[in-house]
Design a protein with these regions (language model features):
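Conserved nucleotide-binding/hydrolysis micro-motifs of P-loop NTPases
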Residues: 140-141, 182-184
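P-loop NTPase catalytic core of nucleic-acid-dependent motor ATPases
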Residues: 2-130
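Substrate-gripping "pore-loop 1 plus following alpha2 helix"
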Residues: 106-121, 148-167
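Hydrophobic alpha-helical scaffolding
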Residues: 85, 118, 136-143, 164, ...
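Short beta-strand segments
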Residues: 65, 79-82, 135-136, 178-181
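AAA+/SF3 P-loop NTPase mechanochemical coupling elements
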Residues: 123-129, 162-180
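Conserved AAA+/SF3 P-loop NTPase catalytic/coupling segment centered on the Walker-B
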Residues: 130-154, 169
Length: 184
């Protein structure tokens, strides 16, 4: 049994919200890790190759760790840019694999097209409920981002969503939104 320094009702977010996708995680998949040191060294080597500048590496790791919290205090839209083949996607693939159902991919059209009519189905947004990390790929050259839509998604306010043939519901997004770009 674990003792917590604060009571669950005093926490800024409900423990139930933090653990809503826990049923999809196999906690017995790795009962013991015999080669932890090797794993740790391999992970550090991998991240050092992708993010060789120490200050940028620290920022990146801090950002990725913030994805786990389910809080969006920063209200940010993050653009990861750089030449193709520099490891951006591999790092996101690793993070997505680690986060399982807590991560998702979103179409960039969510930010490049006009807002949908009120009450229209929005399955892209409905799927983000409870997610901690959402990733988009770069827009086409002539596309512009709908800043109002971006603010709505990342602004830490409740949004309304509706899956196909479902009733609308409101929720506060918990995810960090990353757009992966080779060019800006």
């Amino acid at each position: 049994r674990v003792s917590m320094p604060v009571k669950p009702k005093q926490m800024p977010i409900s423990l139930d919200n933090m653990l809503e996708s826990f049923h999809n995680i196999d906690v017995n998949a790795f009962p013991e890790m015999r080669n932890y040191k090797r794993f740790y060294d391999d992970m550090n080597d991998f991240i050092d190759k992708i993010v060789p500048i120490p200050s940028v590496k620290n920022y990146t790791l801090r950002f990725l760790s913030k994805c786990l919290s389910g809080e969006n205090r920063d209200e940010g839209f993050y653009i990861w840019t750089g030449t193709g083949g520099n490891g951006k996607s591999k790092l996101i693939d690793l993070m997505s694999m680690c986060m399982g159902d807590y991560s998702c991919n979103l179409p960039i059209a969510l930010l490049t097209q006009k807002r949908k009519a009120s009450g229209a189905a929005s399955p892209e947004m409905a799927v983000t409920k409870g997610k901690r990390l959402a990733v988009m790929q770069e827009p086409d050259v002539n596309e512009t981002l709908n800043v109002g839509q971006m603010k709505e998604i990342t602004g830490n306010d409740k949004i309304s969503a509706r899956g196909l043939y479902k009733e609308p519901f409101e929720f506060t997004p918990q995810f960090k939104l990353i757009c992966m770009c080779n060019d800006l």
